[in-house]
Amino acid sequence: MELFSANYEENTRALDDLLGVGRCFDMISRDLYVGGRRARMWVVDGYGDDAVIERMLSFWLPLRDVSDAQTMQQFIDRYITFNEVNAEQNVKNTVTSVFLGKMALLVEGYDECALIDAKQYPARGVEEPSSGKVLRGAHDGFIETLVANAALLRRRIRDPQLTLEGHKVSDCSRADVVLCYLENKVDRKLLDEVRQKLAKIDVRSVSMSQESIAEAMMGKKQWWTPFPKVRYTERPDAATACVMEGDIIVLVDNSPAAMILPTHFFDFVQEANDFYFPPLIGTYLRILRIVVFLLTMFITPVWFLLVKDPSRTQAGLEFLAIDSHYSVPLLVQLLLAEFIVDLLKLASLNTPDVFSNSFSMLGALVLGDFAVQAHWLVPEVLAYMAFVAIANFAQPSYELGYAFKLLRLMLLLFVGALDWIGLVLGCIVIVALLATTKPIVGKGYLYPLCPLDKKALLALLVRKPISRDNT
């Protein structure tokens, strides 16, 4: 059955079967009389706003006659005192709408169903996200409810040019996806490309929300590149700034993270804190972040290259030499330290909040002290790895941190096998990866460096004062 008919019993049987009435404990179905006609309503328990449903029932039940409404649309116009309601004849669309939280109402004599958007999703309060915190500025953040996230953007951009364009993705989950952009600033070609990629997503479910959608949009062509092709933010102010610059924000229901498109490598240099400090300090923070990027990737491979040959640490670089005796090969020590850092991160993530901070500190101290006393690691290795672990948190992207980690491991292996030639070869591989990585949409991944856009590159490196042309 694809469309509702004028047969009331047939319509109700079809919806009861498709919605799982009697099988699913949370599917509420109630028979009632509206104006002397049989009617039935369906709603998912936990989705419906009880106050709204009760108010509508109190209006319908006293009705004596509704024969003046010849169609369901006329019935809606005259007897449903609610803003968000529409008539639907397609059975599949009705079932999907009920699972999304709407209430369905069938009335005898009509070949359409009324869908009333009286949903109220369970949601946590709006609070500052755990990542991307700022010293000053707004302390609110996106949550798992799409409507609330859209409202946070509307609150900041009170412009009729702001468009929130809705889409549905996947066959099973039918996830709600919203594209947020400014009509007068967005690149129309870029917008059409994003729409096409969303329309081509052919997956059964997007249970992991924005990550599932990002992977489906990227496809399988570039699985081998470690660099992130999407930026995420849980901060409404950061998302607002991107929209004002002409970017597209992708909001996904059930996810507090907003996707920023297009994403290029140098976009990760920016962070919300840059704009809550004066321009000079903001510029310093960006330059510091770039230096940290380079140190995070190269400090341990370069140090390993220098200490491999004692003669390289004699010309004023004696402080880099290892004084203590060690029996475990230095390359093995560095790799072991890398894995221990990741082990502590994973253990910290899976530890209850009450114990996580103390566990991380005690775990690092105990393991570090034990490794030195057992001659597994030399103190210098621990010192450099501690710097790398801390520096990873100086950049805003968790995904980029792991990309740097994989490349750092590659450099260590290349240096261990080929000495300085390995370092040069590793740098060539990194440049080749950056040059061949393609973003989901937009220009090259290294934009604005390649293709060169001096104005855009300067705007990324230097935090300019706020003006009418630079907001």
Where are these regions (language model features)?
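Short glycine/serine/threonine-biased micro-segments
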Residues: 99, 135, 366, 373, ...
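Short polybasic/polar patches that bind polyanions
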Residues: 158, 199, 345, 372, ...
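Transmembrane alpha-helical segments that form the functional core of multipass membrane systems
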Residues: 249-250, 257, 263-411
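Membrane-embedded alpha-helical signal segments
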Residues: 1-302, 306, 310-313, 434-471
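Hydrophobic alpha-helical transmembrane segments of membrane transport and translocation systems
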Residues: 379-381, 385-471
